[in-house]
Design a protein with these regions (language model features):
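Short, well-ordered alpha-helical microsegments
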Residues: 190-191, 317
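Membrane-embedded alpha-helical segments of transport systems
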Residues: 185-188, 215-219, 343, 347-354
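Aromatic-enriched
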Residues: 330-412
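Transmembrane beta-strand segments that form the barrel wall of outer-membrane beta-barrel proteins
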Residues: 178-182
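Residue-level signal for cytosolic alpha-helical hairpin/rod architecture
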Residues: 95, 191-192
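Long, hydrophobic, well-ordered secondary-structure blocks that form the structural core
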Residues: 143, 183-185, 193
Length: 412
């Protein structure tokens, strides 16, 4: 995407290089430390990638189904790490098959390859969308990028897939079905893009996605057997109960449910509030589609809506927010003053970095609703999206009057 204006900070290659250098240094340090401390130890720092590696190791041992049983998974995690942690495994079997292959490598190497390659994929997707404004996107998303590097989570992968899907969809390519199908690893994050494919009647892309999903479901069935699906469904039911009981770290979740539940509302009421919010988010998306929003605004709307569909959304899933920002940053900068840009950046960092900062400052134990810190990520994120939408209304009006220097985007 090319644009007829520039911004010294948002297009600064020096800032981009500095941010990515910090991420690379953190990645290298973590990979080395995880490899050096691979032996079980009660003093070990355990992150999300350890859960990937333990689930994959169980798969290598022919016990993939045990990963979905919380009691067996906790025993395995303590055996392999030396630390008793609460990290239920609820990923679909296709991702279990993936981490099984990953676990064939040494821990540090597996972590380094997974995080390094998915980060590169994510940055590539952002670059293709934002163009010269990539530095601004990376600066705004720095808390999420550093968090995802440290934890070894898959936010870069899902964010990159959604970004590549939206690019291919805007170019009317059937290959949009490839990233759509690969989102089978986290189907709750694919609701928005699947809905967009459906209303746009992109049948070829949906056919490609269906073929990929069928293959992705068949492979773990062949490798692990049909029993893997029974174990998976049992694990999902169990994790739903854990979510209702408040056993997950709600303060690191971005959903409306997490905020409502952490304030003391009952699970049923919190789920009802979240469900209403999710329907409203999808309704706004459909409204934007019916009003024929410009493609880049519609793409950003999909990303925003996706963040509020599932009650089980963590801070590392906010990589999707970066994709949405990449689509609108040029217009946002053009239609906002410097003071507004600083305020929006502060809100970006507050909304995306709250869980990370809280974990470091308070180091809370996961002991249940009412004892953990409040989940305060959804409110600033909703405010951020609302403020960006208001600013972008100025862009829409300017485009309609023919005064915007933004180059046209291919129609959906």
């Amino acid at each position: 995407m090319t644009h007829g204006f520039s911004h010294p900070v948002a297009t600064s290659r020096l800032l981009l290089q500095a941010a990515l250098t910090v991420a690379a240094m953190l990645l290298t340090f973590a990979a080395n430390s995880y490899q050096i401390s691979a032996a079980p130890s009660p003093d070990k720092t355990v992150v999300d990638f350890h859960a990937y590696y333990v689930a994959g190791t169980l798969g290598l041992e022919g016990r993939a189904g045990d990963g979905y049983d919380i009691e067996k998974m906790e025993v395995a995690q303590q055996t392999y790490t030396g630390v008793k942690v609460f990290m239920p495994w609820t990923y679909p079997p296709p991702f279990t098959l993936f981490v099984t292959a990953l676990a064939a490598l040494p821990l540090g190497l597996a972590y380094g390859l997974f995080v390094g390659l998915t980060l590169a994929f994510y940055i590539l997707a952002l670059k293709r969308i934002a163009g010269a404004y990539l530095p601004g996107v990376v600066i705004a998303m720095l808390p999420v990028i550093l968090l995802t590097v440290m934890t070894g989570q898959n936010g870069f992968l899902t964010g990159g897939l959604i970004g590549m899907f939206l690019l291919a969809l805007m170019q009317r390519r059937a290959s949009a079905g490839i990233p759509l199908g690969l989102m089978v690893i986290k189907p709750h994050l694919a609701v928005g893009i699947a809905l967009l494919s459906l209303v746009e009647r992109r049948w070829q892309a949906m056919f490609v996605a269906a073929v990929i999903v069928i293959a992705a479901l068949a492979l773990p069935t062949i490798v692990f057997g049909m029993s893997i699906w029974t174990a998976f469904l049992d694990g999902v039911r169990e994790s739903s109960a854990f979510l209702a009981q408040g056993k997950y770290p709600l303060f690191r979740m971005t959903s409306v449910y997490a905020t409502a539940r952490s304030t003391g509302l009952s699970p049923d009421i919190a789920f009802a509030v979240h469900g209403a919010g999710a329907l409203l988010a999808l309704a706004f998306l459909l409204y934007g589609w019916m009003r024929k929003l410009p493609p880049h605004l519609l793409a950003a709307s999909v990303c925003a809506a996706t963040l509020f569909v599932s009650p089980y959304n963590y801070d590392y899933d906010l990589c999707i927010l970066g994709v949405g920002l990449a689509f609108v940053l040029p217009g946002l900068i053009e239609r906002t003053r410097a003071i507004e840009q600083c305020a929006l950046l502060a809100l970006f960092w507050a909304g995306t970095g709250y869980g990370l900062v809280t974990a470091f400052v308070q180091a809370p134990e996961i002991v249940g609703v009412g004892k953990d810190p409040l989940s305060l990520m959804a409110p600033p994120l909703l405010l951020l999206i609302a403020l960006v939408a208001l600013a972008l209304r100025r862009e829409v009006r300017a485009r309609a009057s023919g005064t915007s220097p933004l180059s046209p985007v291919p129609a959906l």
